[in-house]
Amino acid sequence: MRFTQATVRHTARPDEPPGAGDTPQQARERAHPSPSYSAPSGAGGPFGGQDLLDGLLSDEPAAVDADVAGAVGATLARLLATRVDDARALDPLFARDVAERVADFTLRGGRRLRPRLLWWSLRACGGGDRAQVRAALRAAAALELLQTCALVHDDVMDAAAVRRGRPALHAAVAAQYGDGAPATARRLGESAAVLAGDLALAWADDTVTELLADGADLPPGAARRAHEVWRTTRTEMVAGQYLDVQGQATARHTVARAVRAACLKSALYTVERPLELGAVLAGAEASVARALCRAGRCAGLAFQLRDDLDDLFADPGVTGKPSGGDVREGKPTYLMALTRARAVGTGDRHALEVLDAAVGRADLTGAGLDRVRDVVVATGARDAVETRITRLSRRALRHVVLAELPQPRAAAALRELLGEISGPRDGAAAPGHRPAHAPSPPAGAAAPASSLPVAVAEVAR
């Protein structure tokens, strides 16, 4: 079951060279092919048939425990093979340029963080019968498709050329059609990416609908509650993204605003809601689900604060994104809002001048980015954020303990995962960067706050 472009190309005779009979458009497509559709890593290579897809799947909880990411990848592979076949039957060009790219992007995935959180929440809450396993894997697949929608659209909004170390979807489509007018190719790439994100969201909703239709064997009320969580998740994701781009456009970089955006865009969507979905599908009591939601919000905020630090200080080879993207795009991150607030509080004019000259400058040089790093360190913002990450992570683990989860081994796995997502990645220090020492505040200036604003504690309570 491989993606093929044979249906839209001239078929060469044995005595013809490759490409014979190609139209100019087909020649361009041959030079810039769309990605092939392969099985997930470790699944044995490209799809060869439905039997391979069936063999990858298991509704045995122990099998999923051993490789959550692999099980979710197999579920996605089967689901996406069907979706792409449907798209190909509808129109081969649409399938090749849009549907296959959505499938390829989703299957390559990232850390499969949301599926892992959902799964270990389900298991820690005592879930694990076959109906629950199937529902959890479908819900996890839907979360990954929702993430595809978010990332593909995000790259268009940010004009980001790279995602996960590869050309972003809109950039890849533009390159495929790039021998025409550059502006036309760029516009086509952006339009295709918007449609690709829409398609990913539609496929995610289809997957949840199928889950609910087969939900008779789930605990009483689980399907209804899962649907409510799903509806909330979608809206929170969009709201968080809007706060992000609106703050970027209007330069509203207050600390409270940054916390609110981080809560909606990352804490809820990335961590809290997957944990809640797992608890709901397991039939957990409402009190247990609430405790896990609190844990997820704390860990999710820590996750976003870590991401802010990584954008500025981590090795691009680790993150898969150019360093300093948030600064160049003028994103209203917590880290930059806190840096500015501390500079204002201490009367540090030099720091404010550096920030004013750098934030939102797409052409910011490496030297300019180093000056921003120096200011973030010198104001104490970097250390303050690291301290808050540690406190939020500890609070998240306490909430897991307070949930009194019935499965100790799965609960331990969940605690380990929550600790992992907010911890530093390898290569956290930017190569060659030597941070400056913090200067003494001017005489009479207000001392910087000893901790981050109350807003973090309020949303993470």
Residue ranges of each PLM-predicted region?
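Hydrophobic, well-ordered secondary-structure elements that form the walls
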Residues: M336, A396, L414
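Hydrophobic alpha-helix feature that most strongly marks membrane-spanning transmembrane helices
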Residues: R297, Q304, A314-G317, R340-V344, ...
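Conserved N-terminal diphosphate/IPP-binding helix and adjacent helical/loop segment
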Residues: M1-L143, T148, V152, M157-G180, ...
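Charged, amphipathic alpha-helical oligomerization/scaffolding segments
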Residues: D67, A71-R78, T82, V229-T232, ...
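Short, charged, amphipathic alpha-helical segments
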Residues: R224, E228, C293, T387, ...
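Mg2+-dependent prenyl diphosphate-binding active-site environment of isoprenoid biosynthetic enzymes
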Residues: P92-D348
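A glycine-biased, small/acidic residue-tolerant capping/turn segment at secondary-structure junctions
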Residues: R306-T319, R349-D356, P408-A412, A429-H433
